[in-house]
Swiss-Prot record:
Subunit structure: Self-associates. Interacts with ndl1 and dynein.
Annotated source species: Pyrenophora tritici-repentis (strain Pt-1C-BFP) (Wheat tan spot fungus)
Function: Positively regulates the activity of the minus-end directed microtubule motor protein dynein. May enhance dynein-mediated microtubule sliding by targeting dynein to the microtubule plus end. Required for nuclear migration during vegetative growth as well as development. Required for retrograde early endosome (EE) transport from the hyphal tip. Required for localization of dynein to the mitotic spindle poles. Recruits additional proteins to the dynein complex at SPBs.
Compartment(s) where it occurs, according to its Swiss-Prot or TrEMBL record: Cytoplasm, Cytoskeleton; Cytoplasm, Cytoskeleton, Spindle pole
Similarity comment text for this entry: Belongs to the WD repeat LIS1/nudF family.
Full protein name: Nuclear distribution protein PAC1
Keywords from the named record: Cell cycle, Cell division, Coiled coil, Cytoplasm, Cytoskeleton, Microtubule, Mitosis, Repeat, Transport, WD repeat
SUPFAM superfamilies per record: Lissencephaly-1 protein (Lis-1, PAF-AH alpha) N-terminal domain, WD40 repeat-like
Domain LisH: 9-41
Sequence ranges of Polar residues compositional bias: 79-93
UniProt cross-references to Pfam families, sorted A to Z: LisH_PAC1, WD40
Length: 461
């Protein structure tokens, strides 16, 4: 008797073997085995039918389990590799430190309702609301914490190309732009009623952003909106009046994206002319042109001050710029499959390669250590600015098709103001420490992505 099986298990196995030998038409072998195994002689047809197929089922179950074990072992190796490539040595510390959090599959929520590809997403600055825009002409408002659709906003007659929340303090608005040549403003506090339509562009409006307010020299009190268009221009709008207050010309082709600096003093744009351009938001005058990409520049982003120390080190500088300064470093993503990091004077610092298709969106980690990218190769990649821009994580199964957009949820609290004019080293050090502590305290570890596969996904800790 086997030491592994109980008497009952051994009897069940023997009967299953006899039934199997009967199925394969080996009666002599079955009879010989019955005698050798001391199986009772009353192994009738009813008993045989009971055990027929049992051995095959057990065998295939074992094969399936072996396959599953191999898959889990492979997954374990992948996770271990990710673990080893991450800088913090303590798993507990990594889980508790928002400044080191990176997205991972699977997504917390997959939001489905759009009928055409997703083009854009945007987080409400206070509430757990997320807006998504689509080629189906609609905007959908979701509760990203619950993963539920709250409402569908209709008004555009062609595809929605970008959305953004912002506006004067205490009066958050949602702005959207479209291939129908218009920008629309919606009031979240009044069931997303369309309160204003801004015509003026002569072609599709590709991107919009509210211009932040509050900094010395900022042209905005929270009521300005900047738009980029296929008509080769940028326009600045006053959302309280609906008037276009400035038109900025300089690009030679379609302007694909625009991003304001955190203090609203600078605007960064890029497009089909394969350049990115930095503009003074007050005067509309160009400050710098970034030349180096070999194809359309799809997306741009301006580095937050919390990343200055890491980017200055990447640039070979001993001392970072003051935290009060803006547009010191930028990043651009292109159809040439590369990401380029520049300083604010147009000097190329680093080219990041690894994506296999167009770069569609860039986001600096609010902790200042990473740059994240989304691409038509269906992945999200995380680049470590403290490791020479090395790709330390790839979310390979982020979506099932081109990842068209990505946004990071805004911080819970505002950054602590710092005195950028201080020249004393200790004072600057204290300011930097306060800045980092405030940034960490406010980081929400939540990312939203949109895709051609009609899905919006929420990646969260």
């Amino acid at each position: 008797m086997s030491a592994i099986l109980t008497d009952r298990q051994a009897e069940e196995l023997h009967k299953a073997i006899i039934a199997y030998l009967g199925v394969i038409n080996a009666p002599k072998t079955a009879e010989a085995f019955r005698e050798e195994a001391n199986v009772s002689a009353n192994f009738d047809d009813a008993t045989r039918k009971k055990y027929e197929g049992l051995l095959e089922k057990k065998w295939t179950s074992v094969v399936r389990l072996q396959k599953k074990v191999m898959e889990l072992e492979q997954r374990n190796q992948t996770l271990q590799s990710e673990l080893d490539s991450t800088t913090p040595t303590s798993l507990l510390r990594r889980n508790q430190d928002p400044a080191s959090w990176l997205p991972r599959a699977p997504a917390r929520h997959t939001l489905q309702s759009h009928r055409s590809p997703i083009t854009c997403v945007a987080f409400h600055p206070v509430f757990s609301s997320l807006a998504s825009g689509s080629e189906d002409t609609t905007i959908k408002i979701w509760d990203w914490e619950l993963g539920e659709l709250e409402r569908t906003v209709k008004g555009h007659t062609k595809g929605v190309l970008d959305v953004d929340f912002g506006g004067p303090r205490g009066g958050t608005l949602l702005a959207s732009c479209s291939s129908d040549l218009t920008i629309k403003l919606w009031d979240p506090s009044d069931e997303y009623k369309n309160i204003r339509t801004l015509p003026g562009h002569d072609h599709s409006v590709s991107a919009i952003r509210f211009v932040p307010s509050g900094a010395a020299g900022s042209p905005s009190s929270g009521n300005l909106l900047v738009s980029a268009s296929r008509d080769k221009t940028l326009r600045i709008w006053d959302v309280t009046t609906g008037y276009c207050v400035k038109t900025i010309r300089g690009h030679a082709d379609w302007v694909r994206d625009v991003a304001p600096s955190f203090d609203g003093r600078w605007l960064l744009s890029a497009g089909n002319d394969q350049t990115a351009r930095l503009w003074d938001a007050s005067s509309g005058e160009p400050k710098c042109t970034f030349i180096g990409h070999e194809h359309v520049v799809e997306c741009v982003t301006i580095a937050p001050p919390v990343s200055y120390a890491n980017l200055a080190s990447l640039a070979g500088l001993k001392k970072p710029p003051p935290l009060s300064s803006s547009a010191e470093y930028i990043a651009t993503g292109s159809r040439d499959k590369t990401i380029k990091i520049w300083d604010g004077r147009g000097t190329l610092i680093k080219t990041l390669t690894g994506h296999d298709n167009w770069i569609r969106s860039l986001v600096f980690h609010p902790g200042g250590k990473y740059l994240l990218s989304a691409s038509d190769d269906k992945t999200i990649r995380c680049w470590d600015l403290t490791q020479e821009g090395r790709c330390v994580k790839t979310v390979t199964d982020a979506h099932g098709h081109f990842v068209s957009c990505m946004r990071w949820a805004p911080n819970v609290i505002k950054d602590v103001p710092v005195n950028g004019d201080a020249t004393n080293g200790a004072t600057n050090g204290l300011s930097k420490k306060k800045e980092e502590e405030a940034a960490k305290a406010g980081i929400r570890c939540v990312i939203a992505t949109g895709c051609v596969d009609l899905n919006v996904r929420i990646f969260a800790s």
